[in-house]
A protein has these predicted regions:
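Redox-cofactor binding/interface segments in oxidoreductases and associated redox assembly factors
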Residues: 8, 85-86, 199
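Phosphate-binding site of ATP-dependent enzymes
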Residues: 146, 155-156, 169-253, 263
């Protein structure tokens, strides 16, 4: 990455935790390799003078808090950077989609955008996993109350989650369908209009929810196993779970390779799959995380491998 320029489109800099954030680790690695690092938010993108541009800052010291940055006096074309990393966290709302449309235009102008905007536009992360339904727990995408009842009749405990959530937000476990739980379902579906996902609950979650990073189509050999704490059933780090680095097993490797084939076809060079036991639950392609924790605990660096593959 020496003598290269990289632009990161992220959430606000002050919201990124240097000790945990994968985007900061990516900036750090590029900076260590004598590349130049720049950053902007989605709101800084614009189409002006017949080209996609961004108002940016240069990141001088990615790991410092607060991070040392220098504003750039002019708006620069995205095509002038060697790499443009789209690293904005969900939700995938209208602003997110409009930014992707601009990034697709920037691609046409010559920008090298990672991951490809077309793939981020095309796939919902939870629905994308349905392409590998043979590896998934029993899963339905529904919005009607009768479908919820029918699904609950098949399983003693079920999980309900929105299609555009992240970090364990708005995920519920139903052991029975109480009036309160019906109200939760009604709320999440916007009065039975918006699709949600239901799955049978996997008790293997207490043995770890594994984040397996997929880099250039190949599973990284070390995963981050996340464990629920206390009475919680949520293993996401953002929801209070604790992570441990673990070597991936043969099933995780097999699923990772299968998913990796599709991702490479779609221009997704960096992704994360989530697996509970032998089951695939999600494919994260927007801004996969977990790399910092893997590096700190195992001393193996997935981001170094990613940058070498570009």
């Amino acid at each position: 990455m020496k003598d290269t320029t990289s632009l990161f489109i992220t959430d606000s800099l002050d919201s990124l935790n240097p000790k945990k954030d994968t985007s900061i680790l990516m900036m750090e690695e590029i900076s260590n390799q004598e590349g130049k690092v720049f950053q902007c938010e989605m709101k800084d993108l614009r189409y002006f003078e017949q080209i996609v541009q961004a108002n940016i800052v240069e990141i001088k010291d990615p790991i410092s808090t607060p991070r040392v940055f220098t504003p750039i006096d002019q708006s620069l074309p995205l095509k002038d950077f060697n790499y443009v990393f789209m690293r904005k966290d969900p939700p995938v709302d209208d602003d997110f989609m409009n930014a992707l449309h601009l990034l697709s235009q920037a691609e046409l102008e010559g920008a090298n955008v990672i991951n490809r905007p077309a793939a981020l536009q095309k796939f919902n992360e939870k629905i994308l996993a349905l392409r590998f339904s043979a590896w998934m727990p029993d899963t339905k995408v529904i919005c009607k109350e009768d479908d919820l009842k029918n699904f609950k009749d098949r399983h003693s405990t079920i999980i309900l989650k929105p299609l555009n959530g992240m970090g364990g937000e708005l995920i519920y476990k139903f052991e029975e369908l109480t009036s309160k739980n019906f109200e939760i379902f009604k709320s999440l579906t916007n009065n039975f209009q918006t699709m949600v996902m239901v799955q049978n609950f996997l008790p293997e979650i207490y043995e770890g929810d594994y984040r397996v990073l997929i880099i250039h189509g190949e599973p990284f050999p070390i995963a981050l196993a996340r464990f629920p704490q206390g009475d919680s059933f949520k293993a996401n780090l953002a929801a209070g779970g604790k992570g441990q680095s673990r070597e991936i097993n043969s099933v995780q490797r097999k699923v990772g390779k299968e998913v990796g084939k599709l991702l490479m076809q779609e221009g997704v060079v960096f992704a994360g799959i989530d697996m509970i036991g032998d089951y695939l639950t999600e494919i994260n392609i927007t801004s996969p995380t977990g790399a910092r924790e893997i590096l700190v605990q195992s001393k193996q660096n997935p981001i170094q491998q990613l940058l070498q593959s570009l």
